């Protein structure tokens, strides 16, 4: 899993470097349109130095126009690691010929071998096929046309909207069952599955956004709007149902996101994520602590909610508490006690209305 996380992080960094709207991508696109082909290496460490033969040391500031003009020469361009300077033009690269390569063309084969030998980012721009291929270590990624990525991103947004609706239905139903005191592990796991799918699609959309660069601003806005408060509420759901009382609910949600990236989760995986044995029956009754529901009461800060739960232990305990009992809790006066009672009643009514709409 750690290796996969590192791989994803590397890919994000690479895509951000060559995303539309960046000077480097502008220069690459110019070379692509001119159909001259090109080979660009980012980074000039000792390993790169050992495989560079010849070339002109120019050490000038990067500009898209400079890249375009210098790429007309047959050799490779060597840039610094951030792509802000062009160090060498028309360099011949001589990587180890014993390094395996799946590529057939000389330019792409050289690019793959240089990337594997040095770990540097290498960009190969095809002369005839209008394709940009990125290599770094064993990573190989072909940049897609912006129109194709936008179409996929919009499809993913539509899918996310559907799973958001599933989440809304599940969390509404769970809220009603919480007030009725009939929640089982099955309902909690069902809602967590919808969180899993939302997080999985979110990660896919983020990868499109990284690749779209400045073209992905609208997609990012849609994603932010769709996920508003969902992750915060999911973290409180975990805090409600984790077997032992925990303050690490955000870390547990992060772990769920990492697991969602690598595999489809079984019910037992989600049960274990909540701190229970994997063989726990889904029909087992569970009781919420009440963090999620009480957080919906207006003007009740988290510290007061923490005091409430510490005193009454569960949502049912808070709901059954009298005005005087609520008044006894630190930070709650008579006025706030009444607001809490009224707030809980309004939330319950809203949940019933939502289910029947």
UniProtKB/Swiss-Prot annotation:
The keyword NADP does not apply. It comes from the Bacteria. Its EC number is 2.7.7.85. Keywords: ATP-binding, DNA damage, DNA repair, DNA-binding, Magnesium, Nucleotide-binding, Nucleotidyltransferase, Transferase. Its cofactor is Mg(2+). Diadenylate cyclase activity is inhibited by the interaction with RadA. It catalyses: 2 ATP = 3',3'-c-di-AMP + 2 diphosphate. The keyword Cytoplasm does not apply. GO terms for molecular function: adenylate cyclase activity; ATP binding; diadenylate cyclase activity; DNA binding. Pfam families: DAC, DisA-linker. Gene3D superfamilies: 5' to 3' exonuclease, C-terminal subdomain, DNA integrity scanning linker region, DNA integrity scanning protein, DisA, N-terminal domain. ATP binds at residues 75, 93, 106-110. One of its GO terms (biological process) is DNA repair. PROSITE patterns: DAC. Belongs to the DisA family. HAMAP family: DisA. Participates in a DNA-damage check-point that is active prior to asymmetric division when DNA is damaged. DisA forms globular foci that rapidly scan along the chromosomes during sporulation, searching for lesions. When a lesion is present, DisA pauses at the lesion site. This triggers a cellular response that culminates in a temporary block in sporulation initiation. Also has diadenylate cyclase activity, catalyzing the condensation of 2 ATP molecules into cyclic di-AMP (c-di-AMP). c-di-AMP acts as a signaling molecule that couples DNA integrity with progression of sporulation. The rise in c-di-AMP level generated by DisA while scanning the chromosome, operates as a positive signal that advances sporulation; upon encountering a lesion, the DisA focus arrests at the damaged site and halts c-di-AMP synthesis. Homooctamer. Interacts with RadA. This is DNA integrity scanning protein DisA. The lineage of its organism: Bacteria, Bacillati, Bacillota, Bacilli, Bacillales. The gene is disA.
